Each structure stands twice: as structure tokens, then as C-alpha cells.
């Protein structure tokens, strides 16, 4: 970082710290927010944008070779008058980085001359043109777009330290992408009565990247055609990571494929509590069951405080609602060979001792079983359960795809067109992860990977800038400040110095 830039940051930091320093205030006669004589003026010389971080994002995308990769692999336009395929894809993704939630929001950027100058564009596609672009996709085109993203993803991975490649954990799950539309092709009613599409999502736990997203009719079961996408995910990671894990719920316990997956990876899947498994668990002697002790949610580092009243629990008791309370949990393991497998696998049984309550009355006790099947022989039964439960974090990734980048808003009128938009919108989520992986600050790297998309926008994208076009460059002159700017500049310099091959 240049000395001048460092001095400016240090000065701004000192000023805001001085302003926010705790003071012994006297009683104030007026509210703190007392601005009244407010005027607006138009600056005739300078042009600015609110999302100044888009320059660093665009440079990273360009340096990674992603733009050339799209134009070489995805062919939807016979002639480029004037846009290329990469222009459309990035325009849709950058709309999300500018806070857009719908195709119509593109028009705001299109009318902003400073935004166009910031990206070096004469003009960008309008919302109607983008809708037409999405309708041009076939299933093969969407798959090729995902593979193009994955090739760029691998180049970003290749810049990581050796420790990054010790283990890859792939989370697999399905979700319903609801829509209020009535004329969208491919939509159907799901198992829970919602109209929309059934989406398969495969992501990597460490980086939260969406590796594959598959759009299907709303009545499709979660596991439909999932085996081929799991195979593609294994192809993506197996050559780079020393150990690969698959993790999913009972819907993805596809025993027909276990023997094949066993040769390439470790896996832990939930498995339905069928009568044969329950009978095996019941036949195991009580002395073989081991207690499952859950880890505390947090560790008290100072002084333990008195817990506040549990309002939810009090209301449940007062109104006589039925409540299921866990009394104890025990685990045991045994070998089991599913009918469609040639190999024998390890099953961990979790037995929950429950009490069914209504108000202050304990109605009866109940025993429920949960089963997990794995090809790993090293973890303890308790660790298998903990590992399987960590899959719940995948729900947070799906929530961010739904409400962070709005990838499942379904703006088009066709299943494949909506699939294409889903993949492109998820590209914004993936770019966030790539930016985090290229951040020199190791602590901040982890924070970015765990950040919600909204916070990432507010921290690294929503940086007000003047846009100045010179003869050979585009200058983003920052006029705002936050305490992440030092790391922002370090990451920008790291991106400029990287050479992708």
C-alpha cells in the first residue's frame, strides 16, 4: 500500500475514533440528530457510485480468466451486437452486487453514467434483453455454464495453501423454490403444498460455495437424479483434495451408489428408521449403548450470568401445548449391508429418550431412533452423530441463496430459464467466497467465508467512490471510510499481483 494511501486511512481512522470516544456528556437540551438546514446540489464535475467495491470484484473476475472462459464455452448469441455472453452473465451478477433483487433493478445501473464508466462500458443490457438472454439457455448450456464457473473456481483454489486441500466436505440437500406465478412452465405443487420448483443444492462446507444447483419441477423428490450431480461434484474435488466427504440426509442415502462412492470418498448419510434397523438396535444389549453428550453452545469466558426466563417454554406450559423434551441420548454401532450393496457399512444408531408433556403434566415416555450410515471406521459413534448434525449449516447456505442473492426468485417463465438465472445469481455468492479466499488476512478470510451476503455488500461493496476516467485507467477515488478499508486495499493489491493460469 502506498504511503499516501496509508496516511489517509490512518487520519480518517483517528478522526472517527476521536469522534466515537466515550465522553462524559452533560444533559443535552436537544436531540443528537439536529440537522435542519439541508440542501441538495448537483455536482457538475464529479461522478460517483455507492458500490465502489465493484472495481475490485470486476478485476478479480477478469484476472481469473472467467470472462474469456464464458465467451469460449457458452455460445448463445450468433452475433455480438453489441454484447457478448460474458456481458450478460456479469451484468446479472453485478446487479446483485449493486443491491438489486430483480431484473428491473438493472435499469437503475443502466441509467447511471458513473456505473458504466466504473466498468468501462459504453452501455449494458436492459432488463428485457436479459430476460431474452435467459430464455436462450438449454439444459446443456446451463450445465456448461456451471462447469465454466467450476473451472474458474479450481484456479482460485489452486492459489490456496496446502492445508486447504486436506479435506473437502460436500453437503447435499434439496429445497423448494416457491413462486406465486401461475403460468411458469415446469412449476408444480410440492410435498408441503407450495407451488414452485424443487432445487438440488450441492455446496462445499469449508467455503460455502454452491458447486451445483439443479432446478426441477416442484413435485420432484429431493433425491431425483442427484447421483449424477454428486458424481460431478466428486469429479470436481477428488483430484485436488486429499480426503473428500459426502454428507446428506435420508433422501440422499442412495444405497445403489454406495459401493461406487466408497472408492472415491468418505460419506455419512442419514438412513430411514425402518423396522429391520429398529429391530437390530433393540436387540443390542443395554451395556453396549454409550451416552451422547452434546457440546455446550458456547463457553463462558468471564462470569456465568443468571439465565433469563424462558418465555417460550412458559407460554407452552400455560396454554397446555404438547411439548417433546429430550431426557437422554445414547449411541451404538453395528455393521449392516444394504440390499443393493456388495459391501458392508457401519451404521450408528442414535436412541432418544423423550418425554411427551402437556402443560405441567408428563403424559408418557417415548423412544425414537435415528440412524446414520457411513464407510468411515475411525470416528467414534458420537463423532459420527456430531458430523452428521453439522450438515444443518447447509440450511444457512441455502437461505443465503434464497434471500441473500435471491437466486431462487424465479424471474423467468420457464424452468430452464429460471435454472440459468439461479446459477448466475449464485455466481455472486461464489464470487464472495473467491474474494474471501484471496484475502491475505487469514482471520478476515474466515470471516468473509462465513459472512451473510448483505453484510459482505455493506462492508466491501458499499464504498462511495468518485469515478475518474483518465487516458489509460479508471480511478476509483474513495470518499467514504470503514475500518475494513486497509484490508480492502491489501486484497486489491493481492488480486492485481496474482497470475492465474
Regions found by a protein language model. Give the residues of each.
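Secondary-structure capping and boundary motifs in well-ordered enzyme cores
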Residues: 82-87, 194-196, 415-423, 452
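Domain-level cores of phosphate- or acyl-group-handling catalytic modules
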Residues: 220-276
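Short, conserved catalytic/metal-binding motifs centered on acidic residues
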Residues: 60, 91-92, 106, 124-126, ...
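C-terminal structured "cap/appendage" subdomains that terminate the fold
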Residues: 434-477
Amino acid at each position: 500500500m502506498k504511503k499516501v494511501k496509508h496516511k489517509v486511512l490512518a487520519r480518517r481512522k483517528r478522526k472517527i475514533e476521536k469522534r466515537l470516544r466515550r465522553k462524559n456528556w452533560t444533559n443535552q437540551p436537544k436531540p443528537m440528530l439536529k440537522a435542519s438546514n439541508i440542501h441538495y446540489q448537483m455536482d457538475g464535475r464529479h461522478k460517483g457510485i455507492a458500490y465502489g467495491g465493484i472495481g475490485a470484484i470486476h478485476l478479480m473476475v477478469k484476472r481469473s480468466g472467467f470472462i474469456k472462459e464464458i465467451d469460449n464455452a457458452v455460445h448463445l448469441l450468433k452475433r455480438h451486437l453489441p454484447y457478448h455472453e460474458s456481458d450478460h452473465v456479469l451484468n446479472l451478477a453485478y446487479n446483485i452486487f449493486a443491491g438489486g433483487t430483480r431484473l428491473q433493478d438493472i435499469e437503475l445501473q443502466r441509467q447511471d453514467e458513473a456505473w458504466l464508466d466504473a466498468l468501462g462500458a459504453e452501455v449494458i443490457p436492459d432488463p428485457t434483453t436479459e430476460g431474452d438472454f435467459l430464455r436462450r439457455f438449454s439444459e446443456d448450456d446451463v450445465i456448461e455454464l456451471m462447469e465454466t464457473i467450476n473451472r474458474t473456481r479450481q484456479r482460485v483454489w489452486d492459489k490456496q495453501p496446502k492445508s486447504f486441500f486436506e479435506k473437502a466436505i460436500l453437503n447435499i440437500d434439496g429445497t423448494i423454490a416457491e413462486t406465486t406465478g401461475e403460468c411458469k412452465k415446469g412449476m408444480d405443487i410440492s410435498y408441503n403444498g407450495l407451488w414452485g420448483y424443487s432445487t438440488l443444492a450441492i455446496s462445499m462446507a469449508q467455503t460455502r460455495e454452491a458447486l451445483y444447483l439443479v432446478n426441477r419441477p416442484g413435485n420432484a423428490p429431493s433425491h431425483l437424479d442427484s447421483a449424477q450431480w454428486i458424481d460431478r461434484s466428486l469429479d470436481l474435488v477428488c483430484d485436488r483434495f486429499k480426503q473428500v466427504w459426502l454428507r446428506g440426509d435420508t433422501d440422499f442415502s442412495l444405497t445403489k451408489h454406495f459401493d461406487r462412492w466408497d472408492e472415491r470418498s468418505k460419506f455419512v448419510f442419514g438412513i430411514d428408521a425402518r423396522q429391520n434397523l429398529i429391530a437390530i438396535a433393540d436387540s443390542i444389549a443395554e451395556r453396549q449403548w454409550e451416552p451422547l453428550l452434546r457440546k455446550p453452545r458456547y463457553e463462558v469466558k468471564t462470569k456465568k450470568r443468571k439465565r433469563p426466563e424462558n418465555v417460550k417454554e412458559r407460554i407452552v406450559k400455560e396454554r397446555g401445548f404438547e411439548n417433546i423434551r429430550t431426557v437422554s441420548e445414547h449411541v451404538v454401532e453395528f455393521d449392516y449391508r444394504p440390499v443393493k450393496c456388495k459391501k458392508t457399512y457401519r451404521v450408528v444408531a442414535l436412541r432418544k429418550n423423550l418425554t411427551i408433556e402437556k402443560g405441567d403434566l408428563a403424559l408418557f415416555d417415548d423412544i425414537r431412533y435415528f440412524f446414520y450410515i457411513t464407510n468411515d471406521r475411525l470416528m467414534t459413534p458420537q463423532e459420527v452423530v456430531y458430523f452428521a448434525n453439522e450438515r444443518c449449516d447447509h440450511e444457512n447456505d441455502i437461505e443465503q441463496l434464497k434471500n441473500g442473492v435471491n437466486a431462487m426468485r424465479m424471474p423467468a417463465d420457464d424452468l430452464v430459464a429460471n435454472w440459468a438465472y439461479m446459477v448466475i445469481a449464485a455466481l455472486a455468492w461464489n464470487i464472495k467466497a473467491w474474494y474471501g479466499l484471496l484475502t491475505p488476512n487469514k482471520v478476515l478470510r474466515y470471516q468473509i467465508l462465513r459472512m451473510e451476503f448483505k453484510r459482505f455488500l455493506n462492508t466491501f461493496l458499499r464504498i462511495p467512490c468518485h469515478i475518474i476516467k483518465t487516458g489509460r485507467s479508471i480511478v476509483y477515488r474513495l470518499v467514504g471510510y470503514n475500518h475494513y478499508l486497509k484490508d480492502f486495499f491489501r486484497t486489491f493489491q493481492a488480486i492485481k499481483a496474482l497470475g492465474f493460469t
